[in-house]
Regions:
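Positively charged, small/polar-rich N-terminal and surface patches that mediate targeting and assembly
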Residues: 1-104
């Protein structure tokens, strides 16, 4: 399993989530975040608003999901965002107590 963390422009959040769900991702977590990229001017207290979308997926879906995100979230403008992928050792559905990929 992989955890995908997608940082996107707020106006592209819904399109990005729709693209992810179209590939078969069951659920997502969404947070409003603020940050500053490495190329941004180092102005104290100035951050840019973004949305963070988090989901955990089966390994075989990873490339399709990354391609879908890139297709809908890219405006070819600085500040489009980032995607981070990390390995997930295990998962637990607290209610059903199912573990592993069946829990996602």
């Amino acid at each position: 399993m992989k955890k995908i963390e997608v940082i996107v422009r707020p106006e592209l959040k819904d399109k990005t989530i729709a693209a992810i769900k179209k590939i078969g991702v069951g659920g997502v977590t969404v947070c409003h975040v603020q940050g500053q990229g490495s190329d941004d001017p180092p102005l104290v207290g100035q951050y840019f608003s973004k949305d963070l979308i988090i989901c955990v997926v089966d390994d075989p879906k990873l490339n399709d999901i990354l391609n879908a995100i890139a297709k809908v979230a890219c405006t070819k403008t600085k500040g489009d965002g980032k995607v981070f992928v990390t390995a997930v050792e295990d998962a637990l559905d607290i209610c059903t107590q199912k573990r592993g990929t069946i829990s996602i």
